[in-house]
């Protein structure tokens, strides 16, 4: 959706990724605070006031955190034509995408998913939102990113549990569509296979962008779970 997956940044190194984030000294970045510690070479050239780090925890997906993003965007005079770069896993992608979608009726959103689950699922398809009154994703909308840039080296610092979560989601897609390459749960897939699975979800979401028909097949296993 949007301009879709950006293959030119598949398997890119941190220097290339950093230069992408440093399109200018006006770049606006919202990122997982853990990534700031794990990949210090990616972020330093951006003026600190134009980076907002947030903890990647489910309790972050709240109105309070969303207001914090609004304040950050407002204080940096972000306009609808500005790119907002979001770097993180599902929590950060969900929350920041919702804030970007609703700030001034929507700015240009560029996602850099940092977990396997986000690369093949959370960052793809445009769903975004936050938790409310204890209900997960109770407030949300559809807002496809202009670009989704997959930096596969992020996977090198994932915990085994994070890999399992991602491969479990990929296995669900494989059960839905057996033309996809076979994967082995718990093993880190090759970058080309990650891209293949992300494209599969994008095809479904492009055909049914607002989850009214075909896209519901992606809920396979979720309701039972």
Describe the residue ranges of each PLM region.
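ATP/NTP phosphate-donor binding region
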Residues: 1-83
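Residue-level signal for inorganic ion chemistry
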Residues: 29, 62, 113, 151, ...
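Glycine-rich beta-strand-to-loop/alpha-helix junction loops that act as flexible
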Residues: 56-57, 87-89, 220-221
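Structural motif
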Residues: 86-87, 112
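Short active-site segment of divalent metal-dependent hydrolases/proteases
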Residues: 92-93, 97, 225
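A glycine/threonine-rich phosphate-anchoring loop and its flanking beta-alpha core
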Residues: 98-184
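Active-site segments that bind and position negatively charged phosphate/pyrophosphate groups
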Residues: 184-225
């Amino acid at each position: 959706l949007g301009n879709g997956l950006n293959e030119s940044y598949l398997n890119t190194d941190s220097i290339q990724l950093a230069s992408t984030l440093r399109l200018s000294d006006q770049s606006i970045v919202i990122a997982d605070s853990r990534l700031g510690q794990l990949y210090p070479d990616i972020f330093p050239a951006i003026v600190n006031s134009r980076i907002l780090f947030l903890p990647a925890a489910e309790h972050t997906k709240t109105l309070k955190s969303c207001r914090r993003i609004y304040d950050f965007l407002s204080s940096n005079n972000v306009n609808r034509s500005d790119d907002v770069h979001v770097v993180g896993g599902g929590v950060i992608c969900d929350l920041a995408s919702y804030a970007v979608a609703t700030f001034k009726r929507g700015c240009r959103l560029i996602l850099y998913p940092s977990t396997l689950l986000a690369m093949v699922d959370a960052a793809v398809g445009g769903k975004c939102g936050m938790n409310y009154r204890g209900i997960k994703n109770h407030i949300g909308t559809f807002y496809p990113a202009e670009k989704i840039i997959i930096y596969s080296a992020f996977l090198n610092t994932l915990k085994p549990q994070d890999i399992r979560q991602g491969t479990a989601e990929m296995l669900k897609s494989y059960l839905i569509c057996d033309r996809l390459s076979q994967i082995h749960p718990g093993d880190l897939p090759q970058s080309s296979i990650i891209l293949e699975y992300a494209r599969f979800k994008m095809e479904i979401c492009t055909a049914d962008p607002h989850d009214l028909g075909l896209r519901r097949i992606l809920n396979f296993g979720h309701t039972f779970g």
